[in-house]
Design a protein with these regions (language model features):
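Flexible "stalk/tail and boundary" regions
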Residues: 1-7, 12, 22-79, 83, ...
């Protein structure tokens, strides 16, 4: 499981050090793709396979299903950590997420997310200010 929040920097080649706590969980490699809210999602290969199977079974007749499948699958790339524990984030994904030098890695259980540091700060402030409303809506779902 991936949990925690970590600040990292991208180097000039677009590489980012994976938090030490997460490296062993990635094993031989991982999948990075476009995420929601303009961040990137990083999945273990096993988690990715589970998600991909669900995605390819969505109905092709629904435009929203097709759009979401395209967003997730067409943007995906295999990544493998180098000896220093860094992964290379492809240019098109750095551009999608607006990544500059400073990034935040947020563990969200079955994946981790990579955010531009300023975008994360804004997202977190917005979410924290609405936490009571969010909690109320989740309680309606039994959480």
């Amino acid at each position: 499981m991936f949990i925690g929040e970590f600040s990292h920097n991208l180097d000039s080649k677009g590489r980012m050090a994976v938090p030490v706590k997460f490296r062993n969980k990635l094993g031989a490699g991982a999948i990075i793709t476009r995420g929601l809210d303009h961040c990137l999602f990083v999945f273990t290969t096993a988690e990715w396979e589970t998600l991909a199977q669900k995605l390819i079974n969505l109905p092709l007749s629904q435009a929203n299903s097709r759009a979401f499948v395209r967003l997730m699958l067409s943007g995906a790339a295999d990544v493998e950590a180098d000896k220093q524990g860094r992964i290379l984030i492809p240019d098109y994904l750095r551009e999608y997420a607006g990544l500059k030098k400073q990034v935040v890695v947020a563990g969200v259980y079955n994946r981790f997310e990579i955010w531009d540091a300023e975008a994360w700060k804004q997202y977190k402030a917005k979410t924290e200010s609405a936490s009571d409303e969010i909690a109320e809506k989740l309680s309606e779902l039994g959480i």
